[in-house]
């Protein structure tokens, strides 16, 4: 009996050692155990109408998404630009209905490769390749370090001084890149998350001019180049952190195609209570709870709601139309009860796209 007990004890000890042993890969080498760490996802948007001129209304919106670690160092960064142009000399209805693509979406069709050699090293990469070089360059840096990237003037552009970045192929103007990344690092409304998994990061922008109005002899027109933005952290195929935002810049134009004025007060998240959605009160109380949250709070609830979902599941979220209002809101009681009763068609689309763009 004692011998049997001793044998069983030995077997248990062996199984215990095997169970506690580190995992090995197919090459027979030991893989280090993954430790859960805390990160923060932030997003920043920099908007300019400076390229607008007679015959052209233009909004350039540079968006950056970053993941920072507990020390505030960037572990991943993604950048894109919604460069939206409205030709004031073309057919108005055609311009209002057109589809906008971001610079990343355009890829080689953007047409920069081989054309701009600001630093004279003979390397002239496409815009997307240069942006990706900048994304890689800022990894490991803090917000302050990114903000301190040294610049030089070259051909009327503010480009990097550091040969590391120039030799990597990024020789285009990077002032808005820097500003957007710094904003993203300092995003007070970003989402904190913990994970031990390997993750990817995606950013997306969706734009429209559908709400624009044409100029008449009686009144100026307004070109409304509106954009929605989203940033997602994805592990496996599921979103583990999310942020979304939107801009509504307005450019007033006359019948001669001249720019009368341009107005942009900030992104909807930046405006907070200044966006004044809550002021509408009962008229926008789509869930009937007697209150209307400000836009940035509703946006945050949507971001929380999509955590754990795939891009396909976000796209498939059920919606319903508010009778008599034309608003398309969520049909999910959980999201409505949380206070997110804003129109979500554009938000759904851009959040799903950001998850698909994760790399």
Predicted regions and their residues:
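Iron-sulfur (Fe-S) cluster-binding modules
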Residues: 4, 15, 73
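N-terminal cationic leader/targeting segments used for protein routing and processing
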Residues: 3, 26-28, 266
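Hydrophobic core
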Residues: 9, 13-17
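Positively charged n-region of N-terminal signal peptides that target proteins for export
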Residues: 1-8
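Active-site- and interface-proximal helix/loop "cap" or "latch" segments in soluble metabolic
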Residues: 35-359
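Bacterial lipoprotein signal-peptidase II cleavage site
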Residues: 18-30
């Amino acid at each position: 009996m004692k011998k049997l007990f001793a044998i069983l004890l030995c077997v248990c000890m062996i199984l215990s050692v095997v169970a506690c042993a580190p995992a090995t890969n197919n090459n027979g080498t030991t893989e280090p155990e993954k430790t859960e760490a805390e990160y923060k996802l932030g997003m920043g948007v920099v908007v300019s109408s400076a390229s607008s001129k007679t015959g052209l209304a233009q909004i350039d919106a540079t968006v950056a998404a970053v993941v920072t670690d507990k020390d505030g160092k960037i572990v991943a960064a993604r950048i894109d630009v919604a460069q939206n142009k409205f030709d004031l000399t073309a057919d108005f209805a055609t311009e209002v209905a057109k589809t906008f693509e971001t610079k990343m979406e355009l890829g080689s069709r953007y047409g920069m490769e081989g054309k701009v050699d600001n630093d004279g090293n003979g390397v002239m990469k496409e815009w997307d390749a240069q942006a990706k070089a900048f994304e890689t360059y800022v990894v490991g840096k803090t917000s302050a370090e990114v903000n301190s990237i040294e610049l030089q003037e070259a051909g009327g552009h503010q480009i990097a001084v550091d040969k590391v970045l120039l030799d990597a192929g990024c020789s285009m103007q990077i002032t808005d890149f820097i500003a957007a990344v710094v904003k993203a690092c300092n995003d007070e409304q970003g989402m904190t998350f913990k994970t031990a998994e390997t993750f990817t990061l995606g950013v997306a922008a969706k734009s429209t001019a559908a709400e624009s109005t044409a100029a008449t002899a009686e009144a100026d027109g307004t070109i409304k180049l509106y954009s929605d933005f989203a940033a997602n952290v994805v592990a496996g195929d599921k979103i583990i952190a999310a942020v979304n935002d939107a801009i509504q810049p307005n450019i007033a134009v006359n019948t001669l195609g001249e720019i009368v004025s341009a107005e942009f007060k900030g992104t909807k998240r930046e405006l907070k209570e200044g966006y004044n959605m809550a002021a509408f009160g009962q008229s926008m109380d789509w869930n009937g709870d007697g209150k209307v949250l400000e836009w940035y709070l509703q946006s945050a609830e949507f971001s929380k709601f999509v955590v754990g979902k795939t891009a396909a599941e976000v796209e498939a979220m059920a919606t319903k139309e508010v009778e008599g209002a034309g608003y398309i809101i969520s049909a999910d009681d959980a999201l409505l009860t949380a206070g997110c009763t804003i129109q979500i068609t554009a938000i759904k689309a851009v959040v799903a796209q950001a998850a698909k763009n994760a790399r």
